[in-house]
């Protein structure tokens, strides 16, 4: 089924069935076709147009090196990715004018459901946020780890599973104000890399030596 045959609605929420606009003149894929072009996998599912699933897979194949690959650079920085770490800060008191004090209520903290009760202080609320974070970690949902702020009981230090950059807006809900402070930025990269060693070389036509760092992908 093509896009023209399916104007009335979306075939599926899967990325195989979501259209993608390829760059005109692009033949980056095997010097033959553009990123996101339809592949046999989508044809076999009945979709005949450029699509997001194909685009994601194309970009993945461009960037990911096999285990055993060696990468050399001059910075000495590992090709591994680094996850972003934030402080989450909480202030206020859990309130809902339609409920009496002590009533159960669910507060969303950056999308994570936190079970609380009306009348809770920010410090008490943080204890419930810890539970929600533990559940997210156990289910491998967005969060890699967390720990308490060393001095401020209304803050938690949170590290994410991915290595994307996340800028989260401050907002208030049910009397609690929730904000983010980035304390360690993410870094692009992937896999596990070991430093094999450094090599100092004076290249042709260069007066000063250059130090090269060799990293091997091990996982």
UniProtKB/Swiss-Prot annotation:
Membrane-traversing stretches: none
Keywords: Viral baseplate protein, Viral release from host cell, Viral tail assembly, Viral tail protein, Virion
GO biological process, one term: viral tail assembly
One GO CC term, this protein: virus tail, baseplate
UniProt entry tagged with the keyword Glycosyltransferase: no
Keyword check for Secreted: no
Localisation: Virion
Chief site of localization: virion
Record InterPro entries: Baseplate_struct_Gp11, Baseplate_struct_Gp11_C, Baseplate_struct_Gp11_N_sf, Gp11_sf, Phage_T4_Gp11_C
Inducing stimuli: Expressed in the late phase of the viral replicative cycle.
Oligomeric form and interacting partners: Homotrimer. The gp11 trimer interacts with gp10 trimer and with the short tail fiber (STF) composed of the gp12 trimer. Part of the baseplate macromolecular complex which consists of gp5, gp5.4, gp27 (central spike complex); gp6, gp25, gp53 (inner baseplate); gp7, gp8 (intermediate baseplate); gp9, gp10, gp11, gp12 (peripheral); gp48 and gp54 (proximal region of the tail tube).
Function comment: Baseplate protein that is part of the baseplate wedge and that connects the short tail fibers to the baseplate. Involved in the tail assembly.
Protein name as it appears in the record: Baseplate wedge protein gp11
Natural source organism: Enterobacteria phage T4
Gene encoding the protein: 11
């Amino acid at each position: 089924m093509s896009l023209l045959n399916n104007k009335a609605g979306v075939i599926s929420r899967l990325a195989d069935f979501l259209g993608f606009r390829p760059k005109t003149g692009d033949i980056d894929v095997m010097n033959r076709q553009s990123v996101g072009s339809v592949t046999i996998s989508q044809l076999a599912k009945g979709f005949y147009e450029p699509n997001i699933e194909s685009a994601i897979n194309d970009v993945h194949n461009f960037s990911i090196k096999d285990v055993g690959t060696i990468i050399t650079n001059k910075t000495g920085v590992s090709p591994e990715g680094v996850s972003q770490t934030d402080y989450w800060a909480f202030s206020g008191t859990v309130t809902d004018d339609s409920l009496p004090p002590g009533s159960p209520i669910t507060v969303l903290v950056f999308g994570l459901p936190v079970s609380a009760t009306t009348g809770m202080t920010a410090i008490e609320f943080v204890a419930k946020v810890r539970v929600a974070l533990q559940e997210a970690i156990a289910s491998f949902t967005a969060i890699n780890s967390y720990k308490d702020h060393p001095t401020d009981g209304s803050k938690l230090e949170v590290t994410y599973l991915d290595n994307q950059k996340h800028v989260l807006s401050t907002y208030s809900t049910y009397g609690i104000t929730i904000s983010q402070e980035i304390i360690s930025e993410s870094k692009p990269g992937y896999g596990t890399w070991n430093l094999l060693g450094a090599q100092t070389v004076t290249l042709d036509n260069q007066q000063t030596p250059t130090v090269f760092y060799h990293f091997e992908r091990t996982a």
